[in-house]
């Protein structure tokens, strides 16, 4: 399958395929934090991210969630549907943590009675600012119906993920999703789902995600390997 590099991101390289509606995503060993300010090459990270994300996306597909995932091609590669990415990071929070705790001056780990959905404008030059529905409409990123769908679909995905992670003894604190338009103009889930873009805590409150790298708490791949091993025990 011939391929040509069309985009190089922090965590993945994207290549064309012979089918104009399909792309190959190649996961890198690079870890970044604080919008790329902290950066490090970590051997084995790309393989683990691809394994975890492929596994989760396969389960989401089976559960009826429309995603860009087609199949895992190799240790670091997966075949995806080509989408036009919506320039929003859709964050769902089940517990207080990270920037939420800093913004509102509250402790981490407080359970939210109703999960909170937030939007962040995907713009590196602006440091991905926190925005609301009216900003999304002003920037002509999405309309009312599309905004409502993004929130509804994110909440539906959350209900699935919470159950799966609870089954393996992990608490889903929060996560970030990205969506895009497929060739038919339908909004589908894109990007990835791995400890790079979610927070997972074990029963003792230990971080099982990229906060290990972000906060210098230990070896990233050791933690990701534990998450991957646990996921393989899911029914």
Swiss-Prot record:
It catalyses: 5-amino-1-(5-phospho-D-ribosyl)imidazole-4-carboxylate + L-aspartate + ATP = (2S)-2-[5-amino-1-(5-phospho-beta-D-ribosyl)imidazole-4-carboxamido]succinate + ADP + phosphate + 2 H(+). It is an enzyme of class 6 (ligase). Pathway: Purine metabolism; IMP biosynthesis via de novo pathway; 5-amino-1-(5-phospho-D-ribosyl)imidazole-4-carboxamide from 5-amino-1-(5-phospho-D-ribosyl)imidazole-4-carboxylate: step 1/2. Its EC number is 6.3.2.6. One of its GO terms (molecular function) is phosphoribosylaminoimidazolesuccinocarboxamide synthase activity. Keywords: ATP-binding, Ligase, Nucleotide-binding, Purine biosynthesis. The keyword Chloroplast does not apply. One of its GO terms (biological process) is cobalamin biosynthetic process. Belongs to the SAICAR synthetase family. This is Phosphoribosylaminoimidazole-succinocarboxamide synthase. It comes from Streptococcus pneumoniae (strain ATCC 700669 / Spain 23F-1).
